[in-house]
Amino acid sequence: YGTGLQFFAHRHPQRFFDVGMAEQHAVTFAAGLASQGMLPVVCIYSTFLQRSYDQILHDVNLLQENVVFAIDRAGFVPADGETHQGVYDPAFLSQIGMPLYAPSNYAELTYWLHELLKDGCRGPRAIRYPRGGENARLAQYGCSGQDYDFLHRTEGAQAVLISYADEM
């Protein structure tokens, strides 16, 4: 349970399926569940999601199945080694037009996850989050629910720094 779902699995054993190291199967399985009216949430490390690109494209995206991808270990993950860096999912998911959310703190993560699970939300969509807790400095800013936030704004500044999610 590298994605931290052991508590959910224990609490909801009939709603949790561990397919092991079979990302392609996980995505196709989720597409099948979605085709029958369920709302599956597929939790996969970012670096391993690329293994299932064909299934994401053909089984989920082209059919516009109602699947939520929870992309764990997104961004730079130094402690996991060079093979586990989660840096490619924004490129290959945006290529097929899948909405991708990258909250910068826990409040935004909670907000967007609830939004993605609402009944009115349809089609494939994804939310990515880093390994571990949130950046303590960003935690003080709260969640506006907007598409962007100004974390620090100075009149007359000579430079602009743009950040994606919690990475700077």
Predicted stretch roles:
Residues 45, 130, 163-166:
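Structural motif
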